[in-house]
Amino acid sequence: MSTEQENVKKQEEAYSASNIQVLEGLEAVRKRPAMYIGDIGEKGLHHLVYEVVDNSIDEALAGYCTDIDVTINEDNSITVRDNGRGIPTDFHEKEGKSALEVVLTVLHAGGKFDKGSYKVSGGLHGVGVSCVNALSTLLIAEIHRDGKIFRQSYSKGKPTSEVEIVGECSDRGTIITFKPDGEIFTHTTVYKYEILANRLRELAFLNKGIRLNLFDKRPDEEGNTHEDHFYSEEGLKEFVKYLDATRGTPIIEQIIYLDTEKNGVPVEVAMQYNDSFSENVHSYVNNINTIEGGTHLTGFRRALTRTLKKYAEDSGMLAKLKFCLLYTSPSPRDRTRS
């Protein structure tokens, strides 16, 4: 038996209970971050912002938030502020610590699992903001509620201070500031303004009546900073107009729009036909872009085809149609069966 084979055999024999690792708290997120945020490149870096913003959007969908501010700070940290109810800070009996610390340090913790707190949620798995905490060298949570300002700081998922009352206030809301960990995001920790702007613009169209503001405090070469404000009064109708602006001429000026609910599930559809050669379909579930489609998109396509077919039959349109296919083939080989 070779030396290499002997080493392999020894390793197999040495495999025991001592080799089984139990990762506590948010260690699993830091150990395998891509399992939670997709990757640790540029896409994953920006996904951290989306996770925090999604919490604010969920507050808006529940009817408690109207304004969301996202700021890229000079040191490439991110601050997300909303005027929602504010994350609870009272004592959590089961976990033995404040509800704020539970939300920020325990996976699968949050109000999304309580039907009375959120009817619709884009972060049902409840790992979002705790993952952001785990993958940041610094996270500061500031909560405005019950007339007080609560604050707690963290590093790499672990609290570095207790929940403290640092002032008084007359408003409500949550402010999360975090700085991504360069040990995790080795490719880049620099945020791109346009990537965040595109996502916030999309969210504004998907959630009409909500203001999303983006600020970049990093001065450019001329010393200027940038900001954009996204707000949509008509929602999906405006989204279709925006998407169709560079895709040819509309065949029908009026946008086809449907907003209804069935079996407790709200459905909203906006569409417009134009003279371009390819379709442009975007489907979403709870504000999340389902780029691979799904039963919701398949069902929509079938329903649309069925509706158009029925209209054509009922109106007698099919009887008037004539179809002719003319094919000229100069090459004899094109006439073979293969």
Regions from the language model: what does each represent?
Residues E59-G63, G122, R335:
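Conserved ATP-binding/catalytic signature of the HATPase_c
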Residues T66-T71:
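A conserved short beta-strand within the histidine kinase catalytic ATPase domain
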Residues M1-V53, V102:
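Bergerat-fold GHKL ATPase/HATPase_c domain
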Residues Y327-T336:
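Conserved small/polar residues in nucleotide/adenosyl-binding loops
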Residues H46-D54, K97-F113, A197, V240-G248, ...:
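A short, contiguous, amphipathic alpha-helix enriched in charged residues
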Residues S2-N19, N76-A99, G110-E233, F239-Y242:
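GHKL-type ATPase core
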Residues V22-R30, N73-E74, G167-T177, M271-V285:
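Flexible hinge/switch segments at interdomain interfaces of large molecular machines
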Residues K43-Y64, N133:
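Conserved ATP-binding N-box helix of the HATPase_c
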